[in-house]
Amino acid sequence: MGACAEYVCLPAQPEDGALAIKPTNMTYEEAAAVTMGGLEALSFVRQGNIQSGEKVLINGAGGAIGTFAVQLAKSFGAEVTAVDSGEKLDMLRSIGADHVIDYTQQDFTKRGRTYDFILDVVGKSSFAGSMRSLSPDGRYLLAVPGLSQKVRGRWASRTSNKKVTFGAAHPNSEDLLFLKKLIEEGKIRSVIDRCYPLEQTAEAHRYVETGQKAGHVIITVGHEGA
């Protein structure tokens, strides 16, 4: 997963790794995206213990993890607010976001709204502001926390009813099969921005580093076009 190689060694037994047969309604490129984004998103959304009808905000919703997190939260019955740059908002609506916020125009922590679960995929929102944006018993998950956020998060969890947790995904076949079922039911899908041939891997990385990608960038072997 995430390897720029023509071949990869996998465990002999499916239970020893994250292995599943490709969904019949997906291309190989779309299926590749599930393993790098879908599995992490599922782990984070489950850690959020989302209940049907709850309000969920996802910061960094337009990336590889975020696009799956939006769809998974919706499949769990949540009302989802997606935060990202303006050019990604239409895409986020198309995958089910109920509300969208352009972070270059609005700071979600200053809108006076509260959420039952906030998932920060990118780690760039204000910690104090995000805590204020939680409901009294809200949960806040940081996928890429810094040291200061870890210290403040642990303290906040001990001194209030609000809970702060940190991202830790452990891919396994059971989760991959769960995602496969949702895909085959048409409840979630991969969002692919561009495909690059293996020979243009460096160019693909440069594009990703611009921060402009929506969803996934895929490296292909035997490339047949973007």
Where are these regions (language model features)?
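NAD(P)H dinucleotide-binding glycine-rich loop of Rossmann-like/cofactor-binding domains
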Residues: M1-G60
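Short, glycine/polar-rich helix-capping loops at beta-to-alpha or helix-loop-helix junctions
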Residues: A3-E6, S85-R93, K150-G153
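Terminal peptide-recognition signature
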Residues: V8, A41, A73, L92, ...
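Adenosine-nucleotide cofactor-binding segment
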Residues: Y28, K55-I58, K74-G129
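Glycine-rich NAD(P) Rossmann-fold beta1-alpha1 loop
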Residues: G38-L39, G60-T67, G123
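Rossmann-fold NAD(P)-dependent oxidoreductase module
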Residues: F68-L72
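Glycine-rich phosphate-binding loop and adjacent beta-alpha segment
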Residues: D84, V122-I188, T220-A226
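C-terminal capping/lid region of NAD(P)-dependent oxidoreductase domains
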Residues: K187-V191, E203-A226
